[in-house]
Amino acid sequence: MFDLIKAIIIGIIEGLTEFLPVSSTGHIILAEALMKIPSGNVWTKAFSSVFDYSIQLGAIFAVIQLYFDKLNPFSSKKTDHEKFQTWRLWIRVIVGVLPAIVFGFALNDFMDAHLMNFWVVSATLIIYGIAFIVIENRQKSIVPVITNVNQITFKLALYIGLFQVLSIVPGTSRSGATILGAIILGASRFVAAEFSFFLSIPVMFGVTFLKMGSFFRDGGSFTGMQSIVMLVGFIVSWIVAWFAIKFMMNYIKNNDFKVFGYYRIIIGAIFLVFGILGIVG
């Protein structure tokens, strides 16, 4: 029972924070440190790692569900021109994930091993929080030149993808890095968020299957309870992420990202204090 409660709580946190620019990793670390829920033999180190990636995949399914029509090049509802535009969008997404493939996958394990500590996570939470506030203040006098995702060029997609690589540093936030990058490069908030969602699809599928493959190659297997726990976390993350995406896209129609910047600074400060007190490692 406690295992399912933990899966539900972490699934909720993942769903809420994966696409908001606030760092899902930082929030999950905090939650796991504070919950102290008895977890029996289910939450082994290997299973916990795979679980974290499986719930990220659940959040990705929310993107696919919400944007299925827009991302489906085979839709009978689309004209030939619209299908062509959809294929072009997918090519730009692929171009955008190339930096993550080249740098991210190569450095991800190194970063987790050497930078996954409260000093780094709290610092990146605070630094990017300040960055959001500074950049949004600058944007007040700048009119975005890219107001539709189809206006993103291949070159621009690659540059945004380079910003995504920054998220391999724990606490950065993948969506936060790509949204900031896209805004700096001239995209509107709406386009920046939308393209960030699309970039997450191949990245998270790739990372999840790599982690799963590594788990099984090392002789790992799931017990019946672990399978149930993973499925529950996956579904909860999917459902909550659906609402989180809807909320954010409605919110940024009339608001900027500064509130997320202030929030990151507060959470970063809390994370730092908890780290100094030994509550998180």
Curated annotation (Swiss-Prot):
EC number, UniProt record: 3.6.1.27
Main location: membrane
Function: Catalyzes the dephosphorylation of undecaprenyl diphosphate (UPP). Confers resistance to bacitracin.
Record organism: Leuconostoc mesenteroides subsp. mesenteroides (strain ATCC 8293 / DSM 20343 / BCRC 11652 / CCM 1803 / JCM 6124 / NCDO 523 / NBRC 100496 / NCIMB 8023 / NCTC 12954 / NRRL B-1118 / 37Y)
Enzyme class: hydrolase
Membrane topology: Multi-pass membrane protein
Location in or out of the cell: Cell membrane
Name the UniProt record assigns to this protein: Undecaprenyl-diphosphatase
Other notes: Bacitracin is thought to be involved in the inhibition of peptidoglycan synthesis by sequestering undecaprenyl diphosphate, thereby reducing the pool of lipid carrier available.
GO molecular function, one term: undecaprenyl-diphosphatase activity
